[in-house]
């Protein structure tokens, strides 16, 4: 089968189209013909991990070295990128009961990766579900990562109708899904993003948008019941005045300082709280997003598609920083 392979860390130039063996499903696995996979932050990080410093790593510093060892210190252990996808089940293992050949699915495979290829094997107990029937493969492929992360993290800070929420980093995979989920829950949503993506965030349903290149949301006098910081670039001290007395600062990416702030607010039992958490990968979140997408309450807006052989160009396009919505690699005509 065809796949995009990288055997060394570096720029998009390390990505090469190659012929590799087609996988065969184990008794508890499904073989999926991949039609589409988006280029996300995890792909860019994994491709260039050797050149990433601990300060650039969007998690606490003690996790940097274990992560580097897991990915491969000098060269990548996983040589095919792609952690989310949409495609069609081609074959199933003898013990599989959830799926059958012909099923159209979407999935998140996490650090295992492997979606930049024509085929991938996924455990039938994994984070995989039937895709929304009203979405194309390319559209459906953009949903799993954001759906799982945003759904899981928002459960840490349950929203009530009418509450005010600010999403910092509203145009990325997690942020764009968080905007839509918060709106679905009845919140008043403000999205923070850069100039090129203001229209995109508005199209997701945000009530207000803030261009961070023109305005500092911590200085505009507004207060929020929840600030969901996807990027983890702000400090609690700087934005606590933008929280209501019982407001929550929820982080998807964070450093040790934020963890200490979380412990401090928990110990002092002050009204305001800092929450740092890892997302749980639950297939039910995919099912829930599928139903919302079928009902037209979740949108999948694509910036641009690239064919598999242009994966390197897709990475360059994403790294240039001008994208408005997900960028998708299509691996067969039906996935476009």
PLM regions: where:
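Short, well-ordered loop/turn sites that connect or cap secondary structure elements
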Residues: 99-100, 159, 243
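A structural motif shared across PLP-dependent enzymes of the aminotransferase-like
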Residues: 111-124
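Glycine-rich phosphate-binding loop and adjacent beta-alpha segment
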Residues: 230-298, 330-336
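A short acidic, Gly/Pro-enriched loop at the edge of an enzyme's catalytic core
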Residues: 219-226
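C-terminal capping/lid region of NAD(P)-dependent oxidoreductase domains
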Residues: 297-301, 315-336
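Mid-domain Rossmann-like dinucleotide-binding core that forms the NAD(H)/NADP(H) cofactor-binding site
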Residues: 140-211
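Short glycine-centered segments of the SAM/dcSAM-binding site in methyltransferase folds
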Residues: 104, 164, 247-248
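Glycine-rich beta-strand-centered segment in the early N-terminal region that forms part
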Residues: 23-38, 50-109
